[in-house]
Amino acid sequence: MPRPRKPANPFRYFHSSPEVIRLVVMMYVRFSLSLRNVEDLLFERGIDLCHETVRLWWNRFGPLFAADIRRQRVSRMRGFRHWRWHLDEMYVKINGEMHSLWRAVDHEGEVLESYVTKTRDKSAATAFMKKALKRHGSPEKIVTDGLRSYGAAMDELGNRAKQETGRHANNRVENSHLPVRRRERAMLRFRRMKTLQKFASVHASFHNHFNQERHLVDRQTYKLDRPGRLAGACQLGPCPQSQDPARWRRVRIGLTAPVEHLLVQEIVAATG
């Protein structure tokens, strides 16, 4: 009987440590920074690399880390009761042509799906909703604006009774467009649909991981929760066999202390 093959380590052939690669991808995707901004910030912390290395790592590992985050979150969301989705589309210019970025957000601000199309017709809306329903299951209510493509698509899918429309009813998803707009300006817009689709999916996963609903929790709860999310982001992807798991246990032990930069300091120290 053949022995089961272990999954290949994606960090092989890279001289930099996995901790640094995770930190670089997290900084570029999470914050509205350019490639050279990330290069300068890392240089101030003793990590010397080129901005093109940031581009390479983001393209290579961004989708991998995003898939890891999505895999951990999707299974937990399927059992939600009274689940409401908010659907909306935003215009994004690619090489002078307008494209539509369809986005689905639930009532708690979790970005569920992102989908790029050239049109806003019934076929585009149907493809977007099929993709979201296949991955996340069916919600209790679906809130949309007055675009007739949604109604036609829901008639075809047989869930028109779940649709809700109304003034200000879709503010949840419209407000969630703002981080994407800020990131679009930092990247000097997009040049291909494929790039926009990839970035929208990766950005949504990282946004969900770090979204703590800051306006709903007090400062102390926020401080205790923030290092744990950072530690989780720095463990994305398969861990190399040479990595000491006790090192991450030491980090978790210190999470309850008011030392919020502990993990980043250990990452930088590991590269010194």
Where do the protein language model's features map onto the residues?
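Helix-centered, glycine/charged polyanion-binding patches within enzymatic domains
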Residues: 146-205, 211-212, 217
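Active-site beta-loop-alpha junctions of metal-dependent nucleic acid enzymes
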Residues: 60, 114-135
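Mobile genetic element proteins and their domesticated derivatives, centered on retroelements
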Residues: 24, 38, 54, 88, ...
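Intrinsically disordered, low-complexity basic tails/linkers immediately adjacent to helix-turn-helix/homeobox/MYB/SANT
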Residues: 73-97
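Short conserved beta-strand segments at catalytic cores or DNA/RNA-binding microdomains
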Residues: 32, 95-111, 121, 129-132
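Short, basic alpha-helical nucleic acid-contact segments in DNA-binding proteins
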Residues: 56-77
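C-terminal domain-tail junction helix/linker
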Residues: 186, 197-262, 269-272
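Basic, short loop/linker segments at the boundary and entry of helix-turn-helix/winged-helix-like folds
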Residues: 1-29, 33, 46-51, 55-56, ...
